């Protein structure tokens, strides 16, 4: 029985899924806004939000856990120096997922994923909605 197995497999092997979500997470943390397909965006929320929650408690163990999930030192530093303090008073729900039409070519539903309360320095949304 498949009770409570809600993971989207996205037609990928487990190692491919892990690498894909690690890359999406690092891109989202670096740019604070990305454009991807809607199923990937919904599954990305399950990966990113616990990592940001780790940043609210800056212990050595949580830094090691964050590095284990991301494998990117710059993003780990950003989580604990910027994002943790930014979301200190927010209990989850750090992402906004906006539907933005369908992709030309395969008609896949697309979405924009962004961090809430993102800084004005990261408003480099030039052609994100095309």
From Swiss-Prot:
Keywords: Ribonucleoprotein, Ribosomal protein. Signal peptide: none annotated. GO terms for molecular function: structural constituent of ribosome. It comes from the Bacteria. The keyword Ribosomal protein applies. GO terms for biological process: translation. InterPro entries: Ribosomal_bL17, Ribosomal_bL17_CS, Ribosomal_bL17_sf. Gene3D superfamilies: Ribosomal protein L17. Disulfide bonds: none annotated. One of its GO terms (cellular component) is cytosolic large ribosomal subunit. Part of the 50S ribosomal subunit. Contacts protein L32. Belongs to the bacterial ribosomal protein bL17 family. This is Large ribosomal subunit protein bL17. It comes from Nitrosomonas eutropha (strain DSM 101675 / C91 / Nm57). The gene is rplQ.
